[in-house]
Amino acid sequence: HADWNIIKQVKENVSIPVIGNGDVTSCFLAKKMLDETGCDAVMIGRGLLGNPWLVRECVDYLRDGTLPKEVSYKEKIAMMRRHYKLLCEDTNEVSASLEIRSHVLYYLKGMPKSKEMKNKICQCKNAQEIFSILDEYEHYLEGLIV
């Protein structure tokens, strides 16, 4: 657990900008950190895992109070695909297939059959297999919503 009191104490005792960090998982917590500590900015780490939309949500909320919209399962699956493609560009399919495994549960948190999906993706060795599993899952979710 992050101790925001330490951030506040540092801010009160230095004349340089202070960036707060720790346990920020929503735009509301980013605002709370700014208000409670007086820090000049907020840095987000683990809160972004599986939730890259959090940056946009924080900017919008802090700028004009815009409340975050729920991210749809389609957006989450599209982002997993994009994330995987970027990993492939940065390394190769085999390395990307191994790396994406550590991110899947974060993206799928709170979604039906998330553990089963992670297990399936952990068996994949290339893009074709991963995209096929994601297509299957998206089709499954469409059936639940109709």
What are these language model-derived features?
Residues A2-G20, V24-V146:
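Alpha/beta catalytic cores of nucleotide-metabolism and tRNA/nucleoside-modifying enzymes
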